[in-house]
Amino acid sequence: MDATRTGEPARAAADADPRRWWGLVVIALAQLMVVLDATIVNIALPSAQEDLGMTDGNRQWVITAYTLAFGGLLLLGGRIADLVGRKRTFVIGLIGFAAASALGGAATTAGMLFAARALQGAFAAVLAPSALSLLTTTFTDPKERGKAFGIYGALAGSGSAIGFIVGGLLTEYLNWRWCLYVNVPIAVLAVIGALALLHSSPGHPGARLDVPGVLLGCGGLVAIVYGFAEAQPRGWTDPLVLALFAVGVVLLAAFVWWQTRAPVPLLPLHIIKDRTRAGCFLTMALAVIGMFGLFLFMTYYLQVILDYSPVMTGLAFLPLTVAIITGSTQIAARLLDHVAPRLLMAPGALLAAVGMMLLTGLTVHSSYAADILPALILMGLGMGLIFMPVFATATAGVAPQDSGVTSATINTSQQVGGSIGTALLNTVATTSSAAYITAHLTDPAQRESVTREGIVHGYTVAIWWAAAIMLLAGLVAALMVTAKPPKHGAAQGAPVPEQVA
């Protein structure tokens, strides 16, 4: 590991505040809210579109506005947490996220909802890095880190699936607006808990923000994320899409160049030059590419092909959620203290890929219990074995003043991976479906059945791609994540644990 692993040895576990586990509950609650919100609105989107008069062309901005702001501003949010103080940034993010959620729930026009979703994404970009940073600096003993990151990784991995469940229940039994309003009471509880339990880090009030780095880095990320968001509806060769990718690459290249010269860089490059940490970032991005695309296909398959209601669709993901939590808290968290991280991450990716491969056999007549449930369980266990070690290993030994931006880099990998997965796998599915329908539609009377078969064919082809990408994630983890298992007791070079209030 590099210089970021240096620092004052961790204090003995006896010095840690016994209420730190209640602090973990607060952090986990906030993280669940952010991750859940990335998918909960998907279930509510058809109802919101009808209520607010959105067109098919602009409804995607309910999703795109959130992902653009979230993915584009994460590095800035992480550095703000380092400069201003983690607890203060965490509370500001919670309050802002709650206010934006209330605004979205009360939206009377499509534009008002789009603006609220963008604000949600902006405050999520402040909230998510500070949450992970607080976790990193609070739990430094290797055994405790395993338990804490097991819980955090379980929520980070299963939050999207939980979003489908909660979104389905709220949409069917209340209305779509409660998919946004639900964040308000969660945020209020988290703010009260944060003020009472979390330690106030001093921040660095005299430090300067790397403004050129912010403009270049955030601008590049926004262009890349927006490019992937537009790639599916417009096509990969559309001039706007190509221009966005080109601008994004140029800005990010300029960002890297500037970071080598900036007196106080937004993202110190030693963070991503570390082989193990870079491997964790890349593993996360690749794993999420497969996972996010799969969520989308399974949602459509259950609702369009199997004719599930929103509630039934959400509940169908419950075994996946339980499996992710089990893999993260009961397997990875117990083993990470004894085995190298890659010995969890690589088998986890293999397990998830096998689960995906089972889904490539889906047909219009497949059943949930026989054909879908076993695959979801395997995927969930595999993702649990990936997420927890990635979060724990990527943040291990990071200097406290860099914990926020390191946490932001992990979240950025996750967010950009999700954008790529949604765009890439959607394109594969759409192209494959169209080719199948063209080749097999010989009798107009069979149009409906052939179309359904074509849709499922497109899904299965895209799932093969997702499985291949998941295997690539496992290969990256096996080759790049070279960290050894942490020893029991204080970790050498770990940051000093912070106390809860």
For each of these PLM feature ranges, what is it?
Residues E172-V184, A229-V241, S309, T431-A468:
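A membrane-interface helix-boundary motif in multi-pass transporters
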Residues R11-A14, V191-C218, T260-R275, L336-D337, ...:
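Flexible interhelical linker loops that connect adjacent transmembrane helices
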Residues L132, V184-G203, C218-E230, V247-A262, ...:
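C-terminal membrane-cytosol helix-exit motif in multi-pass small-molecule transporters
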Residues D2-A196, Q330, H338-V339, M345, ...:
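Transmembrane-helix bundle of Major Facilitator Superfamily
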Residues R19-A69, N175, P212, T237-L244, ...:
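Transmembrane core module of solute transporters
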Residues V84-L94, A107-G111, A115, L127-A131, ...:
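C-terminal module of multi-pass small-molecule transporters
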Residues V34, I63-Y66, F70, F97, ...:
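Structural signature of transmembrane alpha-helices in multi-pass secondary transporters
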Residues M1-R19, G203, A445-R452, M480-A501:
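Intrinsic disorder in cytosolic terminal tails and internal cytosolic loops
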